[in-house]
UniProtKB/Swiss-Prot annotation:
Native organism: Burkholderia ambifaria (strain MC40-6)
Broad class of enzyme this protein falls into: transferase
Binding residue positions for pyridoxal 5'-phosphate: W101, T152, D172, Q195, N237, T238
Name of protein: Phosphoserine aminotransferase
Coiled coil, from the record: none
Subcellular location: Cytoplasm
Source domain of life: Bacteria
Substrates-to-products reaction catalysed: O-phospho-L-serine + 2-oxoglutarate = 3-phosphooxypyruvate + L-glutamate; 4-(phosphooxy)-L-threonine + 2-oxoglutarate = (R)-3-hydroxy-2-oxo-4-phosphooxybutanoate + L-glutamate
Binding note for cofactor: Binds 1 pyridoxal phosphate per subunit.
Length: 360
């Protein structure tokens, strides 16, 4: 029996994608091979690779000024790869810290330069807000400004993206990419691990403006130098072929759903249902300012936290899995990515109401 999986990542995949992958496991399109067995330079895999790149460009409306790269190492590796590729002769990059992941990015950048904390969304209740542009204290000549536009752990999503003029804006979009349309032209770099909305763990997507490809530090490994990766069409070293294949299936699924405008409407409906339930309750609490509440990752706390384990056990009995909050913040977290259906959120809300009534 399939359950409703609210994992923050690796996360739920569309059932259509899983079934197609299962059907093609032993024989992809009459090739007699699994995608896992293909040469990454053979015509079979190259057709998968090129289709995935093209479909992602179409879905996000990526302009010709930007290259799409498939790398490895996830978002955490990009915390090092970004400064190694962008600092160049400059030593300073600015960071707007809105949660645990942008804090990790800030800390990692200290190994390669002098990161500057331009603004922080931390409050007495933790990370609960996204500082407005007027609050940012940018340095004089930063190599770039870094944001995490959706904080997976803290549930803070930044929707308003300012124009920074000539300063490249770098965004970690790991946990909301493909959940809504984005104006890619506003960004110098977008990066994200695949294991939330793109597909399975193993491939990292980087979208980088072409004019930023010549800024790498000399210490940057060749396999992580964006210019080298771009020049080799993301095939400089053996890529994560099966992860790219799964991502390609997800891209095709998204197109069948009507693209990002349609998926955004679905995500808004799911998030509203869950937040409305939390806010109407005297038993559940979300601490994030409403204007920046994440549509993808919804943390919430029980009024009586001694009942956390009972809540999780009851949820599991109903087929509602992976609801435990991150260890750094506690409580609960429902990750409601693209592949989580509205029916799953309705089932969760029904259970939350039942659990609250039993404890009243």
């Amino acid at each position: 029996m399939r359950v409703f999986n609210f994992s923050a990542g690796p996360a739920a995949l569309p059932e259509e994608v899983l079934r197609q992958a299962a059907d093609e496991m032993l024989d992809w399109h009459g090739s007699g091979m699994s995608v896992m067995e293909m040469s990454h330079r053979g015509k079979e895999f190259m057709s998968i690779h090129e289709a995935a790149l093209a479909d992602l460009r179409e879905l996000l409306d990526v302009p010709a000024s930007h290259r799409i790269l498939f790398l490895q190492g996830g978002g955490i590796a990009e915390n090092a790869i970004v400064p190694m590729n962008l600092l160049g002769s400059r030593k300073t990059a600015d960071f707007v810290v809105t949660g645990s992941w942008s804090q990790k990015s800030f800390n990692e950048a200290k190994k390669y330069g002098t990161p500057h904390l331009a603004a922080s969304g931390k409050t007495a209740d933790g990370f609960t807000r996204a500082p407005a542009r007027a609050e940012w204290q940018l340095s004089d000549d930063p190599a770039y400004v870094h944001l995490c536009t959706n904080e997976t752990i803290d549930g803070v999503e930044t929707f308003e993206i300012p124009d920074l003029g000539d300063v490249p804006l770098v965004a970690d979009v790991s946990s909301h990419i493909l959940s809504r349309p984005m104006d890619v032209a506003k960004y110098g770099v977008l990066f994200g691990g695949a294991q939330k909305n793109i597909g399975m763990a193993g491939v990292t997507v980087v979208i980088v403006r072409e004019d930023l490809l010549d800024r790498a530090l000399s210490i940057c490994p060749s396999a992580f130098e964006w210019k080298t990766v771009a020049a080799n069409n993301s095939l400089y070293n053996t890529p994560p072929t099966y992860a790219i294949y799964i991502a390609g299936l997800v891209f095709q699924w998204l197109k069948r759903q009507g693209g990002l405008e349609a998926i955004e409407a679905r995500n808004i409906e799911k998030a509203k249902l869950l937040y409305d339930t939390i806010d109407a309750s005297g038993f559940y609490l979300n601490k994030v300012e409403p204007a920046v509440r994440s549509r993808m990752n919804v943390p919430f706390f029980l009024a009586d936290e001694t009942r956390n384990e009972d809540f999780l056990a009851g949820a599991k009995a109903r087929g509602l899995l992976q609801l435990k909050g991150h260890k750094s913040v506690g409580g609960m977290r429902a990750s409601i990515y693209n592949a989580v259906p509205l029916e799953g959120v309705k089932a969760l809300v029904e259970y939350m109401k039942d659990f609250e009534q039993r404890g009243a």
